[in-house]
């Protein structure tokens, strides 16, 4: 049995990506239902506050995510969402019979912005919670962030650089995110060590598009209209050749 906890950003900055997020999550969920083994799924949506839409449901019973649950609003209370979920799952495991505690627990956290609205938890408290669960119970935590330095932000609350990745927060990037998440979940559910290159496809997507942007900027700059000083320089450089260019005879 695997405990899966998804903590998904639905703050206002995610506007325009609702359909992509819903589609990506549902596609991942359907893929996981076809894999061997049982899993319990919890899904927490966060903005100003956290909303638990799936509380330890058997994987096969997880309904599709819809626009009724996933709509964007508010700010980014990331720490409250993460801290609250760890506290909830930790307490259940603490008081459950030993044989009822899942062998593996995995948290997947996605956000497109920095923490800016938590009231109950701070970085230090969440960091201590995460480090304790990793060291004592071998919980896995993945952090996928857009428009931020994901590795630096993850480190602030105890998630290593090898478990964090920057992604492009658009239609293509969001779809790829959930494909990669699904692959990582499959590894953990199968009791395989999570490969160091679990995030390779996301890294490659980001790098490829950054190169494309740089190339586009280069050509845009190269073909931009020359300034007066540039034009003067060009005229000076070609002036020695001008004498060699035949001219029409003047009219007398």
Describe each PLM feature range:
Residues 206, 210, 222, 232-233, ...:
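N-terminal regions of proteins, emphasizing targeting and processing segments when present
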Residues 237-249:
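Acidic, low-complexity, intrinsically disordered interaction modules
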């Amino acid at each position: 049995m695997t405990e899966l906890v998804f903590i998904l950003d639905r703050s206002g900055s995610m506007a325009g990506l609702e359909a992509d997020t819903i589609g990506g999550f549902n596609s991942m969920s359907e893929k996981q239902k076809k894999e061997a083994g049982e899993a319990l799924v919890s899904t927490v949506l966060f903005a100003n506050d956290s909303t638990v839409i799936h509380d330890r449901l058997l994987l096969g019973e997880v309904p599709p995510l819809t626009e009724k649950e996933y709509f964007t609003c508010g700010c980014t209370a990331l720490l409250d969402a993460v801290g609250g979920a760890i506290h909830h799952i930790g307490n259940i495991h603490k008081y459950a019979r030993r044989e009822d505690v899942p062998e593996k627990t995995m948290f997947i956290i996605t956000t497109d912005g920095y923490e800016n609205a938590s009231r109950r938890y701070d970085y230090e408290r969440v960091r201590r919670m995460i480090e304790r669960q990793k060291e004592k119970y071998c919980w896995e935590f993945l952090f996928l962030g857009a428009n931020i330095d994901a590795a630096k932000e993850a480190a602030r609350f105890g998630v290593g650089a090898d478990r964090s990745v920057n992604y492009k927060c658009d239609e293509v990037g969001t779809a790829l995110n959930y494909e990669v998440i699904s692959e990582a979940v499959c590894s953990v559910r199968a009791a395989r060590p999570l490969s160091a290159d679990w995030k390779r496809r996301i890294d490659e997507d980001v790098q490829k598009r950054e190169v494309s942007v740089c190339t586009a900027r280069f050509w845009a700059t190269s073909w931009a209209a020359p300034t007066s000083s540039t034009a003067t320089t060009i005229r000076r450089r070609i002036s020695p050749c001008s004498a060699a260019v035949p001219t029409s005879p003047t009219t007398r």
